[in-house]
C-alpha cells in the first residue's frame, strides 16, 4: 500500500511540475505482447488518452491463447478433439496507464517506472469438438458441445520500467492476473461427464510483458 501511495504521489507531482504546455503526449498507441505461467501468449493493441502527463485512461483489444494444455476431458467412449484442447479468447480491457516522471534522464532517453491496472473482459462463450471413439480408440464420429457458464472477466496489473525515446516508448516488466484460462470449460459436460475435474486447479497467473508505444 505504501508503495502504491508513493507511486501516485510521484505521478501527481510530476504532472504538476511539467504543466500542460505540450500536448504531444496526450494520445498513445501501443502494441503489447505477454507470456504467462499458465502457458499462454497474449497480444493486444491499445489506445490511451492522458488528461495529465503521467496518468492515462484507455482500452486494449486483444487475444490470448494457450500453447500447451493441462487437461483432456475423456472417457472410454469419447475425448475432446486435438484442436479444442488449448484455451483461447478475444478480449476487451479498459485500463489505467500510470508513469512516474523520469528517474534517469539523458539526452536521448528518459527512464522511469510504470503501472497498468486493468479489467479484462473475455468472450463469455466456449465451444468444444468431441471425438467419438470405438473400443480400440479409433475415431468413429464427431459431436459438439458449447457453454456460456463461467467467470468471463479478470483483474490484472502490470508493473515495470519504461524507456522513452520520444515519440517511441518501450516498457517491460511483470504481469499478474487472476484469469482462470479454464473458466468457460469447467462448467461444461458431455453425456453426464463434467469437464471440470480434468483441468488443473484454478490459480492466479504471472508473466512478463513487452510493449512498444507511440505518442501522438
Question: Where on the chain are the PLM-derived regions?
Answer:
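Predominantly the C-terminal beta-signal and adjacent terminal strand-loop region
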Residues: 154-216
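Outer-envelope beta-barrel architecture signal
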Residues: 16-29, 53-59, 107-113, 166-168, ...
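Flexible, solvent-exposed coil segments and beta strand-coil junctions
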Residues: 20-28, 68-79, 133-143, 189-193
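Membrane-embedded beta-strand positions of outer-membrane beta-barrel proteins
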Residues: 27-33, 57-61, 94, 113-117, ...
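Residues that define the transmembrane beta-barrel architecture of outer-membrane proteins
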Residues: 25-27, 37-43, 65, 86-94, ...
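Extracellular loop and loop/strand-boundary signature of outer-membrane beta-barrel proteins
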Residues: 30-33, 75-86, 141-148, 194-200
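Gram-negative (and chloroplast) outer-membrane scaffold detector with strong preference
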Residues: 46-137, 213
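Cleavable N-terminal export/targeting peptides
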Residues: 1-24, 216
Amino acid at each position: 500500500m505504501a508503495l502504491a501511495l508513493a507511486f501516485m504521489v510521484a505521478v501527481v507531482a510530476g504532472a504538476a511540475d511539467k504543466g500542460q504546455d505540450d500536448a504531444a503526449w496526450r494520445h498513445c498507441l501501443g502494441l503489447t505482447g505477454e507470456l504467462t505461467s499458465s502457458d499462454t501468449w497474449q497480444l493486444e493493441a491499445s489506445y490511451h488518452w492522458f488528461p495529465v502527463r503521467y496518468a492515462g485512461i484507455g482500452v486494449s483489444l486483444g487475444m490470448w491463447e494457450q500453447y500447451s494444455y493441462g487437461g483432456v476431458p475423456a472417457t472410454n467412449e469419447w475425448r475432446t478433439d486435438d484442436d479444442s484442447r488449448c484455451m483461447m479468447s478475444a478480449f476487451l480491457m479498459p485500463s489505467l496507464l500510470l508513469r512516474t516522471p523520469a528517474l534517469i534522464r539523458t539526452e536521448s532517453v528518459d527512464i522511469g517506472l510504470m503501472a497498468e491496472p486493468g479489467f479484462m473482459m473475455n468472450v463469455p462463450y466456449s465451444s468444444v469438438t468431441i471425438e467419438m471413439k470405438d473400443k480400440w480408440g479409433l475415431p468413429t464420429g464427431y459431436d459438439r458441445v458449447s457453454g456460456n457458464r463461467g467467470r468471463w472477466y479478470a483483474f490484472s496489473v502490470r508493473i515495470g520500467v519504461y524507456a522513452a525515446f520520444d515519440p517511441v516508448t518501450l516498457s517491460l516488466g511483470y504481469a499478474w492476473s487472476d484469469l482462470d484460462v479454464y473458466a468457460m470449460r469447467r462448467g461444461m459436460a458431455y453425456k453426464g461427464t463434467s469437464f471440470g475435474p480434468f483441468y488443473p486447479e484454478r490459480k492466479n497467473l504471472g508473466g512478463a510483458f513487452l510493449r512498444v508505444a507511440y505518442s501522438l
